[in-house]
Amino acid sequence: MILKKSYIRDRINSLVINFTFKFCKFENNGKILVKSMDGIGDILVRSKLAEKIIEKYGKENVYFLMKDHYKNLGEFLGYNVIGIPRKSEKSFFKRLKMMYEINKKYSPQKFLNIEFGNDSIVANIVAKDKIGVRDNSQMVQCYNGYYTESFLFRDINEKILDKIKDIGENILENNLKVEDILPDLRYKFPIDNKDIVIAVGSTARNRVCSPLKMKEYIEEIFKIYPEEKIILVGNGNLQKEYAKKIIELLPNKKIIDFVDKTNLMEAFELVTKSKLFIGFESGLYNLCFVTRKKGIGLFRDTSVPFAHEVPWLKNIGPSEKIDRSVKDEEYPDEKINSISVESFRNALEELK
C-alpha cells in the first residue's frame, strides 16, 4: 500500500515536534487529557464512558481533545474541551505551537485515547501514562509505540458498545457490563412527537440510496402518517441537490427542505422533537440511539458495528436479490438501492 501524503506529512511533523520537545521541560502532574476527536456519532455513543472518566478523576481534572467544529457539542455535554483547529493538523508551525501550549498549560499526567483507532496526536502529548487501543492499520501503526499501555479489541467485528466496553475496562481498570456504558442523553435534549425527519446524507456516498428510491419510501410514510410534515436535514452541496431532487419528484407534498439551514444543535433539536427519524449511518442516527428516539436506519449491511440493536431503532438492509432497476449515476450503489419498499413499510408499521 502506498502511504498517502497526509500520513507522511503527519509522521514527519510528529517526529520533528517530538525531537524538539526533548529540549523542553514539561510537568506531568496536571490534567487528564481524553482524546475524542472523531465523528459526532462516536462522541455521542461514548458519552456514558466519558461520564465515568469524569466521575473517576473529577470534572476539574479532565479535558477532552476535540476537533474545533465539535467543541460546542462537547461543551453542551458538559465537558471541558480543548479545541483542535483543522489548520493545526496540516501546518507544522501551527501544530508545534498548539502542542507546546497544550503540554505547557495542562501538564498532562495521563493521556487516554477513547477513540476506536490511533493517529499522530499520541506522539506529541507529553504525559507519564498514555493508554489507548492498538491500531494495526498500516498507515498509523507506527504510533502504537508511543503508548505506555495499549490493548486490542476482543473481536474486531463486535458491536460498538462492546468496543466501548473494552476501552472502558482498559482505561478505567474496572470490569464493566454493556449496561454500564449504555448512553442515555434524553435529559439533555427537548423531546416532542411531531413531524418526520429524514437525514439525506452520510459519511460516504455509497451509504446513501438514490433519491428515486427515497421517493418510494416517502410515499409509504405519507400513507401511514398523512398528517405529518417531512423535514429534510443535512449539509453540503451534495445534500442540497439530493433534497432538491426529492422535492422535484414529490411536488405538492408537505416536505420542508432544511438542508444547510440549521446548525448542528438545531438539527439535533429537530430530530429529538420528531415523531420518527429516517436516515443512513450518521451522527443523527446515533443521536436517536442515545435519546431513545424512534428511527429507521438504512444500511448497506446491518451487521456493521454502528447498527444498534435496540427496540426503538429498526435497521433495514438490502434484499437477498440485488435490485438493479435503479439507474442513478450519482447514487449507483446497488446494495443500498436494494432495500425493498416492503421492508421499509414493515419497519414503519412496527414503530408506529
What are these regions (language model features)?
Residues 43-54, 69-72, 217:
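Short amphipathic alpha-helix
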Residues 60-94, 254, 315-322:
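Conserved nucleotide-sugar phosphate-binding/catalytic loop shared by glycosyltransferases and other
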Residues 93-99, 213-300:
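Donor-binding and catalytic core of enzymes assembling or modifying cell-surface/extracellular glycoconjugates
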Residues 133-154, 257, 289-352:
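Nucleotide-sugar donor-binding patch of glycosyltransferase catalytic domains
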